[in-house]
From Swiss-Prot:
This is Small ribosomal subunit protein uS17. PROSITE patterns: RIBOSOMAL_S17 (PS00056). PANTHER family: 40S RIBOSOMAL PROTEIN S11 FAMILY MEMBER (PTHR10744), SMALL RIBOSOMAL SUBUNIT PROTEIN US17M (PTHR10744:SF1). One of its GO terms (biological process) is translation. One of the primary rRNA binding proteins, it binds specifically to the 5'-end of 16S ribosomal RNA.
Amino acid sequence: MTDKIRSVQGKVVSDKMDKSFVVAIERKVKHPLYGKFIRRTTKLHVHDENNEAKLGDIVEIKECRPLSKTKSWTLVRVVEKAVVA
């Protein structure tokens, strides 16, 4: 068994919850028959103790123990702040 902690980067798509937000992680998958690359999106609920992340930010998250029914990821750092127009 490996003890490597998974960490990924994604974009914050919702920050309406207290101490939580939703991250969308995009990946490209090749269609098995036609060979075209298709974008697939995974949405993850993330714990944010200090409410640091805002809508549109690029964040790095890591896997942790289950914190609730849907939350098992925590915020590591905000990689890039969203540009406010």
